[in-house]
A protein has these predicted regions:
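RNA-contacting regions in translation and RNA-metabolism proteins
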Residues: 1-380
Length: 380
């Protein structure tokens, strides 16, 4: 291989593997030293001259100039030394160039294996770093296969997977389909970096809205909370720092275009967009939309709320199989007890009766009786 070929080979490896050229040069240097050691296993006196710009490459052996050579791998006589350096003297050290062709097939193969392995390791590390800094972002990939329920994706330079538990249940994919997911973890494996994506993570919904709604990416509209039952229904709470911009309208878009783009991406997941407010009573009532709420009674100590609704709003507030109230709990961070006014009055009467009974007990103060009754104790 001539010098120009060496320069091009180093550049090509660097380009194709996206690995720093200096690292490739150092790896080749180490590989050549290893090849020399394999050819001459009893000595360790090798240096490599490698110029990535000119392609000059040589493996050199450090040898001491002696009168009589007993160890040819370590010593050289003065006559031969003068062919290398005409100023060489007895006892001096000269660098003798070795012929790579003399290394033998095994030594050259060792050098090649080291080069390939080190470059592969560097490439894997670079890919791992590349995707690690993209944790929390959305990535698109092409379905390669379905393996043990996991969807395996090709991201170009890396392999990704959507584990079964991170998939929307009713979604089905075929080889060649394009899929988007939220990067929630990057692993180092024996096969190289593996990127783990999720289709069910609440942050996927947040990121999709950030893509579709410029006001979010511009910092005008903020998503304060996200609640999802993936593939079925979701709620997001939004606010605007510009009174001229309606946060709900911005997320919905003209004729629903923005929210529908997100709905399509999530296979028809219905999305409620709720105006956020830093007043728990109001926020909780909004979170239970489309139901109308009559009153919200807060227990701030337990971060729990009793939500009073009319009889005809009860099933709507709770939702099918409790879905609406579950999402409201996720969205607000408050425990919610959705009841009718009649049920609330019944519970209140029972609590007052219990409180009265507890007050009659010796040693039970008014405050203790109230606390016990509120906690559900009828008698002791």
């Amino acid at each position: 291989m001539n010098n120009l070929n060496i320069v091009e080979a180093l550049s090509q490896i660097s380009r194709e593997k996206n690995v720093d050229r200096e690292l490739v040069v150092q790896t080749l240097n180490d590989a050549l030293v290893s090849a020399a050691k394999k050819r001459f296993p009893d000595v360790d006196n090798f240096e490599v001259e490698l110029d990535a710009d000119t392609g000059h490459m040589a493996v050199l052996a450090r040898k001491t100039v002696v009168e009589e050579v007993n160890e040819p791998e370590l010593e050289i006589d003065l006559e031969d030394a003068r062919l290398i350096d005409d100023q060489a003297q007895m006892g001096a050290v000269v660098l003798e160039r070795l012929n790579l062709a003399d290394f033998g097939r095994n030594a050259i193969q060792t050098a090649k294996q080291i080069l390939v392995q080190r470059v592969r390791e560097a490439e894997r590390e670079q890919i791992y770093d590349q995707f690690s800094i993209r944790l929390g972002s959305i990535e698109s990939g092409t379905v390669q296969q379905i393996s043990h329920g996991d969807i395996v994706l090709n991201l170009g330079r890396a392999e990704a997977a959507i584990p079964l538990k991170e998939q929307i249940r009713r979604e089905r994919y075929r080889q060649g389909d394009s899929v988007r997911g939220y990067i929630f973890e990057v692993l180092k494996t024996t096969r190289g970096p593996q990127v783990l994506l999720s289709r069910t993570h609440p942050e996927l919904l947040r990121k999709l809205f950030s893509i579709e709604v410029p006001e979010i990416s511009e910092g005008i509209v903020t998503i304060h909370a996200v609640a999802r039952e993936p593939g079925e229904r979701a709620k997001i709470a939004v606010s605007s720092n510009d009174e001229r911009v309606d946060p709900v309208g911005a997320c919905v878009g003209v004729k629903g275009s923005r929210v529908q783009a997100v709905v399509r991406e999530l296979s028809g997941e219905r999305i409620d967009i709720v105006p956020w407010i830093d007043e728990p009573e109001v926020f909780i009532a909004r979170a239970l939309s489309p139901a109308s709420v009559s009153r919200v009674i807060l227990d701030r100590r337990r971060k729990h709320a009793a939500v009073i609704v009319d009889e005809d709003q009860l099933s709507l507030a709770i939702g099918r199989s409790g879905q609406n109230s579950r999402l409201a709990v996720q969205l607000t961070g408050w425990g919610l007890d959705v009841i009718t006014d009649q049920e609330h009055q019944t519970r209140r009467a029972l609590m007052e009766e219990s409180q009265e009974e507890l007050r009659r007990l010796r040693g039970v103060t008014e405050l203790i009786a109230l606390s016990l009754a509120t906690s559900g104790f009828i008698s002791i």
